[in-house]
Amino acid sequence: YIRVVNGLLIYILLGIGLNIVIGYAGLLDLGFVAFYAVGAYTYGLLASPQLDLHLPFLLIVVIAALAGMITGILLGIPVLKLRGDYLAIVTLGFGEIIRIVINNMDWLTGGPQGIARLDKASIAGIEFTRPVEIYWLLLVVVVLAAVIVWRLEHSILGKAWAAIREDQDAARGIGINTTRAKLAAFATSATIGSIAGVIFAASQRFVSPESFTLQESVLIVLMIVIVVPVALGLAIL
């Protein structure tokens, strides 16, 4: 049952990340699974015989977080002026493009076969291999993410997100830099999603495109729309 709990914690972490763009900023992102994949494949490439680098776990987390943030900004820039259904369609397409690219880059990602024999996650000599050890790692990360996002929600940036969610034109009219606020939402959300991907890959010690399908993306969105309408506290519950 610990494996089931671990799966739930990963979805909670993903929900916390996606809630930034959907719940706080009111931006319907249907391609969030792409950032999840970026994190997972960052770990898959840097902690396996695939590139034979075998970097330390924490270093990979940092690299994956940066990769996720950059990917989030790259997605955010072309969709800045899109809203509603148009935004949803473009982000959905982005998520599918990432999956298709991963699926077809056999020479790097292993294609449909994925990447196996990933290194064990280890911090300061402590290995996280058994489900109960992964559970504690996930719990710490989820709590940290929840606290950070809660602080952001009550910051000036969080108030800017709320204003954009209520009325983007009015927010711009009162002097809020909506471009910067939106990019910050995408970047922060993508960073958390990417970190979730790293832990997922480390816990499975295997990663493949099948874990990042459209259905997975929709499931994460449903978690936000149904389970966590706006409040971060509901996401944790």
Question: Where do the protein language model's features map onto the residues?
Answer:
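Transmembrane alpha-helices and adjacent helix-loop boundaries
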Residues: 1-237
